[in-house]
Amino acid sequence: MLMNTAEYLSIIENIKSEITVAQYRAAIHVNADMLLLYYDIGCVINEHKSWGNKFIDNLAADIRIAFPESKGYSVRNLKYMAKFAEIYPDREFVQQVVAQIPWGHNIVLLDKVADMDERKWYIKKSAENGWSRNVLVHQIESNLYQRQVLADKVTNFDHRLPSPQSELAVQTMKDPYVFDFIPFREDMLERDIEQALVRDVTKLLLELGTGFAFLGNQYHLNVGGDDFYIDLLFYNLNLRCYVVIELKTGDFKPEYAGQLNFYLSAVDGILKKEQDNPSIGLLLCKSKNNVVAEYSLKDISKPIGVSEYKITSSLPDDLEKQLPSIEDIQKRIK
């Protein structure tokens, strides 16, 4: 019997899926066990602070003698364990939350993030998105938490989108967006920025966030026999809607909202299917007056957000190999 029937192929896919899930759970379990061990060692070190630094030096030496093939018990790492236990006094919290990410990621957070709420957020996002250590460092150094969580965002999502899509759309949005992979020039035109973003679409997707699928730039729409072109068109699988992005190299102007409103009406009329949520527009400007932007969106019928963008050309060279491929991103968001 040839094993190529639909039933057999379905069985194979199910088994492969179960193996993958089991491997992931095993890896998480091993990581959790190791982090709890590090936590317990850190607690012991903190309980004997009065013994001074020599205690850690001797501890590292004796562990190395007892377990010569084991790594991770250097003086430096033992000090991190002590800091780890000091910052997270709740062992159950470590087991359920912190253990979602590897030890190396936790060291990054210990070094670079002081606020507990911010640290929890980066733990959650690292686990959800599968960020490498280098990507996590980059996101922290680009102030992602401040841009995505703390920013005073200008949108009309609350009044134009149903719940929970409105809340999710606001959470997805950043202000400003940081395009630090584009070579900066003072005389850059909108088309120059657009083409640079498309050339590095993997990095663009990383900055936009989870769930974005790139559909095209200068996306053609024929409306009543007239031709129109959208700067950047995406579909967001988390929001289940089209996302239209328009780029402007100068300050925000009220007429930009009207133009984007028209594009969203066209996308909803031509591309949107019955199962899709209302399309969302994102207007990216070099700068904006929040009050002017808020008044401009007040009576606009379509859901639109207005953000600034920054071009810094500071993306580390070694981050390139850490970025997921387009195929990886597509697999992750399915």
Listing of model-derived features with the role each one plays in the protein:
Residues 1-334:
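Basic, low-complexity intrinsically disordered segments
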